[in-house]
Curated annotation (Swiss-Prot):
GO cellular component: cytosol
HAMAP family the UniProt entry points to: RNA_methyltr_TrmA
Official protein name in the record: tRNA/tmRNA (uracil-C(5))-methyltransferase
MF-aspect GO terms: rRNA binding; tRNA (uracil(54)-C5)-methyltransferase activity, S-adenosyl methionine-dependent; tRNA binding
Family membership: Belongs to the class I-like SAM-binding methyltransferase superfamily. RNA M5U methyltransferase family. TrmA subfamily.
The entry's keywords: Methyltransferase, S-adenosyl-L-methionine, Transferase, tRNA processing
Main function: Dual-specificity methyltransferase that catalyzes the formation of 5-methyluridine at position 54 (m5U54) in all tRNAs, and that of position 341 (m5U341) in tmRNA (transfer-mRNA).
Ligand binding (S-adenosyl-L-methionine): Q188, Y216, N221, E237, D297
Species annotation: Colwellia psychrerythraea (strain 34H / ATCC BAA-681)
GO biological process: tRNA methylation
Length: 364
């Protein structure tokens, strides 16, 4: 099933993506795109597998996206080497361990460039005290591969051995940034390309000055790397988990000019306009911010109409998109007031139809 995933095929698939993007955005007067390729193998830091039980045997499976048929997975060439090593070691260790094996239906892996690993094991059964005892033994055995933590999940249960996050280190422009990444929260899966995205955004905002507002800031991925280019940064995020991670990451990186508030872009727009007062903003005077630059990294649905109207109020817009189709729709509105200065293609997902794009727009 993975025969197409090979370094010999990488350049051709990337070239096709360039052609597809040029065709999709042909109605816009785009500058020549900046292109940021991925390494051709072992680039994903996250992977999820179902577990198939067959007599005494058990193995990972995935499902064909077109036929929906299951297929066996012993190696996963797009995942990090650390994940591939852990995949094999985990099954070999639990194969004859009933407490860890019985009713196990899924395993999720989260690894880092810094060499840490988090494994989540999902069950169709309640987890008893014996499960934790055996999970601690499993952790000790797998720790010969890398620093590892294990999470057991069942209905209304979550057992952590010993933490539910990893600490990633990303090198951007010769500087290392540290990020807490929590299980089940969003992180960029291709860490190498993420480093390139952060560098591109850093360089695009050099000497920008003023303040940066980031909507959908997640764990502070962009805000932290861009903080040095701005006087102040204000990030908004609706996930409590991501807000907590962002606060930790701000502290870990010794940054003192970022604030994070938990609210949606719609709520932030209402606060900016003075339409509503929020207790969460009691310590912030939004009238003191210089609303010059905004960064948005929305979900696949893109920006809704109200959010488009919000970002149009800024002189500079940095738009990171995981869905070119919704980006195209949003750009059709944004180019009425702004011009496209930079356009970038980030190959976050080689050998798939998906591509991450970045656009810098400035007011006409």
């Amino acid at each position: 099933m993975f025969s197409h995933i090979h370094p010999d095929n990488y350049d051709a698939q990337l070239s096709k993506k360039q052609q597809d993007m040029a065709k999709l955005f042909s109605d816009f007067n785009l500058p020549a795109p900046d292109l940021y390729p991925s390494v051709p193998l072992n680039y994903r830091q996250r992977a999820e597998f179902r577990v198939w039980h067959e007599g005494d045997d058990l193995y990972y499976i995935m499902f064909d996206s077109k036929t929906k048929e299951k297929f066996r997975v012993d190696d996963f060439p797009v995942a990090s080497e650390l994940i591939n090593n852990a995949m094999k070691a985990l099954l070999a260790t639990i194969k004859d361990q009933r407490e860890l094996r019985f009713k196990l239906f899924q395993v999720d892996f989260l690894s880092t460039l810094s060499g840490e690993l988090l494994i989540s094991m999902l069950y169709h059964k309640p987890l008893e005290d014996n499960w934790q005892i055996e999970a601690e033994k499993l952790k000790a055995q797998l720790s010969t591969i890398a620093p590892v933590d294990i999470i057991g999940r069942a209905k209304k249960q979550k057992i952590i051995v010993d933490k539910d996050y990893v600490m990633e280190s990303l090198n951007v422009g010769g500087k290392t940034y540290v990020y807490q990444q929590v299980e089940n929260s969003f992180t960029q899966p291709n860490a190498g390309v993420n480093e390139q995205m952060l560098l591109w955004a850093q360089q695009a905002t050099q000497n920008a000055g003023g303040d940066l507002i980031e909507l959908y800031c997640g764990n502070g991925n962009f805000s932290i790397a861009l903080a040095e280019n701005f006087e102040r940064v204000l990030g908004t995020e609706i996930s409590k988990t991501s807000v907590r991670s962002a606060q930790i990451n701000i502290s870990e990186n010794g940054i003192d000019n970022i604030d994070i508030v938990r609210m949606s872009s719609e709520e932030f727009s209402q606060a900016m306009n003075g339409e509503r007062k929020f207790r969460r903003l009691e310590d912030f005077d939004l009238t003191t911010y210089n609303y010059d630059t905004v960064l948005v990294d929305p979900p696949r649905a893109g920006l809704d109409r109200d959010s488009v109207e919000l970002v149009r109020r800024f002189n500079k817009i940095i738009y990171i998109s995981c869905n070119p189709e919704t980006l195209k729709d949003n750009l059709a509105l944004l180019v009425e007031t702004h011009q496209i200065d930079k356009f970038a293609l980030f190959d976050q997902f080689p050998y798939t139809d998906h591509i991450e794009t970045g656009v810098i727009l400035t007011r006409k």
